[in-house]
Amino acid sequence: MNYHDLEHLHPPFPELGEEVEIRLETAAKEGLLLFERDGELHEKPMEPWEGGLRARVPVHASPFRYVFRLPEGFWGSHGLEKTLPRYDRFFHLLAKPLPPEWALGAVFYQIFPDRFRQGRPELVPRDGAWLYGGKPIRKKAWNEPPGEEGAREFYGGDLWGVLEALPYLEALGVEALYLTPIFQSPSSHRYDTEDYGRVDPHLGGEEALRALYGALEARGMRLILDGVFNHVGATHPWFQKALKDPTSPERGMFTFYPDGAYASFWGVKHMPKLDYASALTQERFILGKEAPVRRWMRLAHGWRLDVAHSLGEGGTNRKNARWLRALARAAKEERADALVFGELSYDAVPTLRAHTLDGAMHYAGFAHPVMAWLSGRDLHGNPVALEAEEAWRTLLDHYQALPLQLRHSMYTLLSSHDIPRALWRLRGDKERFKTAYALLFAFPGSPALYYGDEVGLSRPNPYEVWRGDPYCRAPFPWDEALWDQDLLRFFRRLVRLKKTYPVLRLGGLLPLKAPTGVLAFRRRLGGREVLAYFAKEGARLAVPRGLDLLREEEVAGEVAARYLLLEPLE
């Protein structure tokens, strides 16, 4: 069998121009490394090593594209092909800047600040304190379910509350927090920023952020902020100047049309879209010392870029890769170990292969196929008949297409503030919910928990209303009597395994033969393996003698299970 993954690159995170040893595990005795340079394919003879073949080449470009020529054919990212593969089926290697080591396989926890925990009640906005969308905002009681007013509803969670919750998060095993936007905004979701230089006073202001950052640093934990750099809020002074004065310098920061209309996020008029063709936009968001992407790296460890796939010029995503790359480089100039990943809601591969970001929210390559398989419905509630084998092929295809260095920094999720919660989509089926999360933690990438999933937080609306926002943004239930303690124990075990088993954190992904209806794969690193099996309804599995990592017991022969992570003992 042929096998090539990140562990076969030495060094795995090279500088541009640095020589890299590229290895292939294979039974073949001879082969060539073919790599693309300046539009031509070049050959490098491979020499034997104890596990197969190897060759040394300088990384002249990023991405550096290559494929192996063996006696039986060409071995590329998607396996063996008899004829030369397309370039998109070559392996893609990137040179620095690359994801920081701390982020590889790290366990993330997403927090929607207004709904997580209230630390200082005096910070909660008063009922009707201002108008949003022409209507007064609403102060809601913590135990009230979210309603149709959505962004107008304030529960009063703040950064002091997040600080208070750190012992809970540390006990869970979380390594990094991702906070949805924290900068001043008139809405509770804060995706319509009106001041990038000011942490929202209703969240505790910069004082609370500094305290939170310091406490996280002391615990060895990281903080990721949400960078809303595709658009601003309509109340932002820059947009107000542009709107009122066509001769103002700010006018060029936005795209106005002859009829007076302007480009906005999804046509939502209170979120006018930035134009990165503007020198002023570039100065204020990328180049300037006080550009938010730079300034806040003094109090955080990275960014999640909102609607990263849409950012660009002229009211479009033109030159998207260029500007994503520039934002990421700016953050890393301020903090060398910064992590910058994007909300790439669809196929993330083309953007990531262009050496732009450190990773992406793994919707298309993980969350959507897994939840479609286990729930029988797609993201929008439409029936889907997806079999385990089909789901596996989708997962593997996306994994194989990723640049090797980004396979372990994908923000891998099942629930978020934008999509229905996983437990709700599974209609409260706790065993399928466990199966989904066991799969998430067994899969390559950085597993991400959405606040409350670990205690069984779901949502109140009926299934006739199949929607994420606002129902997926319910407040965290801090009354422990409301927690599903069995789920919480299960999540703590999953987190512990991800953190303590290098093969689960950094291992490659390989197929594993399994019965019909079972999604199965192997993780492999340095000759060690974990076998992973998942079945929607449960299955009888024939397994070698090994340690069941979740149940912490030895098994062998025939085993009945919905999910099984097995470390072979033979």
Where are these regions (language model features)?
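Conserved aromatic beta-strand anchor motif in extracellular beta-sandwich/beta-rich domains
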Residues: L33-R37
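Short beta-strand and strand-turn-strand segments in soluble, beta-rich domains
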Residues: G39-L41
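Active-site and adjacent substrate-binding regions of carbohydrate-active enzymes
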Residues: N2-F13, V20, L24, E30, ...
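Short amphipathic
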Residues: L53-R56
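Surface-exposed, short loops/turns at beta-strand junctions within beta-sandwich domains
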Residues: P58-P63
